[in-house]
């Protein structure tokens, strides 16, 4: 049985359209809704986000990120034997976005491909799932992607949510290895909190039933997130006998700089050891962690042999952590 699942390549993609807080404030003002750069930055740390054009889908973003990860890994794409896509904004009700990505990438080896839906915890859940497949010995090269077009589900009459989210994709290639890779994973959920972060609508009989836009109780999410993120991070570290002092980099879900800083502080980690891209990306849900990872890998901050702690929290309520060696 393979001992580890190791990241051998990363990639990411942001749509070209960059929307600043000033741009968004101008757009909302036309609807009679007040906001400002200061208001958004002070509450979230977000200065800009990227939004996809109307004809661009989650799979389009995913393919761009995957191409980079495959190139970085230096492997034949036909050797990929499993594709997992974490998304809450799939191209269609079905088939899965993962199958669409498989076709667009030209992977013709009939490997399994499926979507995983855990909202902003999605990438952590997907990474943990891929880890289990590799450790079992059933698969050797797994493409894991987080991709979202949250701009499609934003209510632009609600300034408390529409200013927070962006679109994008991030990807990693995990490969079976005898060298340390993923050291531990931890995942949890609590369905009692379904209503604090959700899109409470559906399509039935060709009609939309309920609210098709994102709804969030920001205060409830904040309180729960800081609490569970600290606990799940410590759970993952304890499982691998790693202390906070041994963590080189913390990559939290990029939702809100205050939640991120609160989590780092509880763990006793200085801000300099936290990768933060929320100011430029906004909250990209399942894409946020792999996007931040790829940015830090490509700018040289994250290097081979370093210990990285990733943690995410999202609707459901879901949360999880992955501790790994690069």
Curated annotation (Swiss-Prot):
Enzyme Commission code: 2.3.1.180
Keyword Transferase: yes
Compartment(s): Cytoplasm
Catalytic residues (positions): 120, 253, 283
UniProt xrefs under SUPFAM superfamilies: Thiolase-like
Function summary: Catalyzes the condensation reaction of fatty acid synthesis by the addition to an acyl acceptor of two carbons from malonyl-ACP. Catalyzes the first condensation reaction which initiates fatty acid synthesis and may therefore play a role in governing the total rate of fatty acid production. Possesses both acetoacetyl-ACP synthase and acetyl transacylase activities. Its substrate specificity determines the biosynthesis of branched-chain and/or straight-chain of fatty acids.
Domain remark in the UniProt entry: The last Arg residue of the ACP-binding site is essential for the weak association between ACP/AcpP and FabH.
Record's protein name: Beta-ketoacyl-[acyl-carrier-protein] synthase III
UniProt gene name: fabH
